[in-house]
Amino acid sequence: MKHFNLVFLPVFLLHTLAFCKTPEKSLQHPSPSEKIEIKTAADQPEVYLPLLSGKKVGLVVNQTSILSSKNNMHLVDYLMMEGVEVVKVFVPEHGFRGDADAGEAVNNEIDKRTGLPIVSLYGNNKKPSAAMLADVDIVVYDLQDVGVRFYTYISTMHYVMEGCAENQKPLLIFDRPNPNGDYIAGPVLKKGFDSFVGMHPIPVVHGLTVGELAGMINGEGWLKNKVKCDITVVPVKDWTRDMAYSLPIKPSPNLPNDTAIRLYPSLCFFEGTDVSLGRGTHFPFQVYGYPDPKYGDFRFTPVSIPGMSKNPPQQNKECYGKDLRNEPLTHRFTLQYLLDAYAVSGKKEKFFNNFFDKLAGTDQLRKDIIAGKSAAEIAASWETDLDAYRDLKAKYTLY
């Protein structure tokens, strides 16, 4: 039985893309005169509206689920305007409006604007149940991802796929560009280190769109009991993975711009330490520091910011560190920031908290840092796994 469909992509092209190994290319920033207007799946209603006609629809969406071609109209509003019978909305971490802090509870509610029930998939309940899907004929997933394993929207997608598969509900995935899709990097997650911030044996920077990753999850049998989800992907039009993509809406409260998104895979490891990565400032994931002058010359003081960062690490303490806001947007993953902070800390094992290994997807990274290995030595140890992943990834590449 076929469980992965690609809307309107010719069959011969699908097979070609599935088995070609595409080399990683440098990120390209076209000049205004040669700028190509891509179309996300949401901006292709001529493709998906016929698939939703006459059906009761459940949506997995948040503030990023917009139609750029309709002045950033939200997908919920657009579908209802077009007469699609939307019956409920499922939401990930950060909630429907994207204003809940990292780790903050997201509650079920009724949306005041539309009257639709909002069902949280973050917290105690992460998978849509049979009861939640009983009045739904088809589910649509449209969340802007950033291409990093510990960004939890792909974990939500995994559970949505699982819930749909277990309850025989088709899933329509609206694809969007991956702003970190031009390369892969970092350790591949090892068995026994899976969690909601890492559910799949993929590298930290995985280089896939959500549509491609859904195909991999399905094809590799990573859902519970190896169930298969009936997936249809609406691909992005006129986008390639070496094409720079600036997100029109910030994907979560603490990724406010392109620089933060490119630095995110490198700096998020500080979440597994007591070093601040700028939560509680207006430039999160663009700086790092600690209340000790030996960490660097740049100074900042994290404070509680409602809707962005409540009670951030090192709150109300002056931190010293590095300002990375002028890093080029071609920036790629590096361990150097983490190693530099570790070196000046003098804390050895106490530098890390229990969350670090979950972010890394292994305990080997922590052990290598403690052993004094360089960034180059550590990265070299990942190459065998990354080569195997490149071969796996090539089977599911759509762009």
Language model feature labels by segment:
Residues 1-34:
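Bacterial Sec-dependent N-terminal signal peptides
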Residues 237-312:
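Glycine-rich, aromatic-lined ligand/substrate-binding cores of catalytic
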Residues 145-157:
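Glycine/threonine-rich flexible loop motifs
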Residues 194-264:
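Conserved anion/nucleotide-ligand pocket segment
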Residues 85-93, 174:
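Short internal beta-strands
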Residues 107-135:
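Glycine-rich oxoanion-binding loops at beta->alpha junctions
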Residues 281-383:
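Conserved functional hotspot residues or short segments at active or partner-binding sites
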Residues 98-103, 172-194:
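Glycine-rich, charge-decorated loop segments at or immediately adjacent to ligand/cofactor-binding or catalytic sites
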